[in-house]
């Protein structure tokens, strides 16, 4: 497994059939890979580091941009040009809302994109 988030001890984890532990981010990446996603468009944020780790392990390319709206528009353009699902991954809060214009554009154009928004850790919710 990758080590980008080794310092993140407060992430969702689950046990696999063989008894090993897997993070929620790795589960997301496995699901993306199973659906044929080979590229994600994103702006790096702390709430989504585990997803990056999983994507690296699954061979999913990570395209890091300078604004979440750019990531959403890039996912839209990718979907239109390749016919594949475009995937935008944003961090929690403003990261999600910054992608809304690009997601709305894709929606109105019937472009197949998926927007995954991050969430703060469970301990921040006192769970």
Please place each PLM-identified region on the residue numbering.
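N-terminal alpha/beta PP-like core and its mobile active-site loop of ThDP/TPP-dependent enzymes
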Residues: 2-127
């Amino acid at each position: 497994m990758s080590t980008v988030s080794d310092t993140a001890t407060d992430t969702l984890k689950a046990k696999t059939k063989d008894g090993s532990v897997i993070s929620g981010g790795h589960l997301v990446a496995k699901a993306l890979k199973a659906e044929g996603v080979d590229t994600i468009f994103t702006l790096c944020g702390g709430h989504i580091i585990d997803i990056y780790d999983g994507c690296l392990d699954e061979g999913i390319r990570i395209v890091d941009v300078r604004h979440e709206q750019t990531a959403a528009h890039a996912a839209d353009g990718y979907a239109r040009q390749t016919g594949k699902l475009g995937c935008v991954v944003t961090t929690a809060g403003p990261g999600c809302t910054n992608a809304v214009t690009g997601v709305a554009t894709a929606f109105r154009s019937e472009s197949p994109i998926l927007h995954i928004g991050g969430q703060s850790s469970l301990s921040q919710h006192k769970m």
